């Protein structure tokens, strides 16, 4: 996390940025709860007890998070090291995995469904946000590393089989994988790409405008989205290539080693299922009583 780009700037001006904000109020279909949270997250602590107004305030929660941590760190980091090495991770990522072994290190976790060519652009934004926040916390004295959770266990193939890109004519173009590549009941991360992926990659570059970056980008995409590779590995490999310099740790929850580490959590959740369901129902009633919509 020593890269200057991981530093925590106090203001956009200090970062050399000129911002022209687009308020979410101007974007259709936003929920009232979301907009109220953006305006004043602290006012919603009834529903979000750990809400903060400024990101640097999160450091105060580190002792609580560390005290609640139960996973065996060495086993966790061994699994993460093996996964990220397979995906082509750089020294920065492997160094961060070693940092995570320390009992005083916290993880800043973001995540998103895996998708064709990484999916929507905000997937990359989410990943870089974790990098920036981990850098901010580390700079202020809380050891932190960025982690990105690849949501490989999702079963909704229709949501992740298509990528939308801006074509040469300035319009949106859809690039899709075949529907029959996925079998009902199979996590999308376990879908295995076949030879047709080469045609899909070619269609992408047929519609994209050419630039000085085309050859390099084509090499990255063809290396990641290759026949016989799982959808999880393809997405992970491309994301790794794109953000390799920033130390981002990728996590695939389908990995058997990680599932074994999570077994006690699943056992506890199953044991307390009635209690959890009752708590969710009670919170939904509270939200609706405050003129918000139920979240689940």
Where are the predicted features?
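N-terminal targeting/trafficking signals and adjacent low-complexity tails
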Residues: 1-296
């Amino acid at each position: 996390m020593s890269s200057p780009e991981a530093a925590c700037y106090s203001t956009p001006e200090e970062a050399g940025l000129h911002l022209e904000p687009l308020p979410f109020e101007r974007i259709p279909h936003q929920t009232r709860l979301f907009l109220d949270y953006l305006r004043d997250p602290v006012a919603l602590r009834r529903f979000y007890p750990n809400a903060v107004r400024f990101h640097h305030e999160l450091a105060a929660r580190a002792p609580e998070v560390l005290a609640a941590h139960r996973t065996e760190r060495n086993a966790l980091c061994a699994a993460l090291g093996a996964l990220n090495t397979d995906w082509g991770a750089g020294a920065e990522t492997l160094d961060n995995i070693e940092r995570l072994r320390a009992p005083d290190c916290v993880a800043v976790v973001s995540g998103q469904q895996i998708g064709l060519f990484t999916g929507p652009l905000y997937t990359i934004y989410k990943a870089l946000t974790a990098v920036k926040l981990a850098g901010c916390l580390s700079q202020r004295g809380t050891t932190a590393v960025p982690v990105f959770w690849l949501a490989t266990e999702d079963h909704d193939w229709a949501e992740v089989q298509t990528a939308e890109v801006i074509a040469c004519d300035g319009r949106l173009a859809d690039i899709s994988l075949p529907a029959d590549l996925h079998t009902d009941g199979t996590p999308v991360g376990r879908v295995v790409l076949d030879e047709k992926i080469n045609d899909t990659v070619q269609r992408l570059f047929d519609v994209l405008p050419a630039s000085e970056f085309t050859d390099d980008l084509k090499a990255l995409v063809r290396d990641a989205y290759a026949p016989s590779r799982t959808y999880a590995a393809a997405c992970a490999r491309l994301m790794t290539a794109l953000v390799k310099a920033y130390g981002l740790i990728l996590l695939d929850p389908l990995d058997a080693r990680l599932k074994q580490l999570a077994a006690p959590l699943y056992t506890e959740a199953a044991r307390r299922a009635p209690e959890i369901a009752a708590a969710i129902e009670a919170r939904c009633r509270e939200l609706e009583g405050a003129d918000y919509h139920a979240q689940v």
